[in-house]
Amino acid sequence: MVEKSVHEINKKIEDGSVNVVTAEEMVGIVENLGVEGAAREVDVVTTGTFGAMCSSGLMLNLGHSEPPIKIQKLWFNNVEAYSGLAAVDAYLGAAQISDTRGIQYGGAHVIEDLLRGKELDVHATSYGTDCYPRKVLDTRITLDDLNEAVLLNPRNAYQKYAAATNSSKRILNTYMGELLPNFGNVTYSGAGVLSPLSNDPDYETIGMGTRIFMGGAQGYIIGNGTQHSPSSSFGTLMLKGNLKEMSSDYLRAASFAGYGTTLYMGIGIPIPILNEKIAASTAVRDEDIFTDILDYAVGSRDKPVIKQVNYAELRSGSIELEGKNTPTSSLSSFKNARKIANELKEWVKHGKFFVSMPVEKLSREGSAKSMKQTQAVPLVKDVMADFIVTIKKNQTVQDAAKKIWENSFNHLAVVSDTGELVGILTAWDISKAVAENIFDSVESVMTKKVLTCAPNEPVDLAARRLDRYGVSAMPVIDTQRKVLGIITSDNISKLLARRY
């Protein structure tokens, strides 16, 4: 039986006799020596991850101006920071987007620009007080001008993350990257074998006060992260570190098309091998870490699981999905994760980094709750018009014109002989056909690619689809494509009027 203490390991770090390996190397060591042998041989295992961590931000202090100002609103390079703190304290979120450049530039870019030594435009406003009389401030600053610049990240270093795919017929732009139609690709995130929390799944050595590698400098875990869900192996960490000591090699801003900005963070955690149980945990392989592939075509919180896979399958470059070979790609960098684990290994090996035990362990049970919503989410069936005029595809344009005139309705659902939706015809389509002397069947002038929605779909999703494609109405259909009604922009406008 092997038992060590952190004090004993730190003495070895101090005298240079410590044996430190990466989590990737530990797999082979346990295979060759067994768990007990590995626990005797190895003192520290280093881990690493480098990925998009949206829930990150910078806590900063600007120092007092002359005359002084109690900042109410604050912008850095036209990116707004939260300033509802003391006079010149502020928090800049990585995902906050620019007022002028939109999602191409955001809080993450401001943070990286600061780290790279660039000068920032600062604009601040206030209501003015006797002790803080100034109302407007414009200046330029660099990182060196700030009293404090503490990277304070509410949720980083997920233990693992669900992969993503897309069953719809169009490209989806998401925080999981670009998802191609018809299950065209799978994207995933996480370092697998090098993942810090996957190498200590019971959080024996990782918790409040643990010293870590953060953005190229030493940082600390200050507790579990938001949405910490240990019961489903989706643990998270809340971290802090001094931005002034970090490196842009391990902190990079990014913008995801159609989604927004994020901050790529490099995190590494050393795990002291105190006993055989911890040694066994640090021998986890990609094959041992499973996650679900979710369908992002469903615009709902609870997305359907398409398949369960392990990280070895994801990292192989392709998996079988819906009967075909589907490419996989990572949004995080395993190359950088490996680089972090190796750099941390060198720090420990050369006495530049000492391991520490948490003053309080992370919770091992529990899961994140969904938002409490006091107002029912309106569904399409709640606002749709259940009276809809239909026409057969083999009827004439004159028949269609007569139906629109008799019913004062601008949209006709075109159905087959068995009642399935096959197209849609509008008053504009009929006017165009008449102008071009086309009096053939409805099928020759109808729109065949019809946007539709389901009765139990949230109205918000239907409204987004109407707006995206610039149409004013969509037929509501069941699973057999039978027409149940129609939802129009007018229906949605009336709903909003009732809400507000």
UniProtKB/Swiss-Prot annotation:
Pathway noted in the entry: Amino-acid biosynthesis
Outcome when changing C54A: Loss of activity. Cannot grow on sulfide-only medium
Transmembrane segments: none
Annotated SUPFAM superfamilies: CBS-domain pair
InterPro entries: CBS_dom, CBS_dom_sf, CBS_domain-containing, HcyBio, MA1821-like
Location of the active site: C131
Entry's EC annotation: 2.8.1.16
Catalytic activity: L-aspartate 4-semialdehyde + reduced 2[4Fe-4S]-[ferredoxin] + hydrogen sulfide + 3 H(+) = oxidized 2[4Fe-4S]-[ferredoxin] + L-homocysteine + H2O
Domain of life: Archaea
Pfam family, any one: CBS
Keywords (A to Z) from UniProt: Amino-acid biosynthesis, CBS domain, Methionine biosynthesis, Repeat, Transferase
Record's subunit section: Forms homodimers. May form a complex with MA_1822.
Similarity comment: Belongs to the L-aspartate semialdehyde sulfurtransferase family.
Function: Required for O-acetylhomoserine sulfhydrylase (OAHS)-independent homocysteine (Hcy) biosynthesis. Together with MA_1822, catalyzes the condensation of sulfide with aspartate semialdehyde to generate homocysteine. Likely functions through persulfide intermediate.
Protein name, UniProt field: L-aspartate semialdehyde sulfurtransferase
Protein's organism: Methanosarcina acetivorans (strain ATCC 35395 / DSM 2834 / JCM 12185 / C2A)
Native organism taxonomy: Archaea, Methanobacteriati, Methanobacteriota, Stenosarchaea group, Methanomicrobia
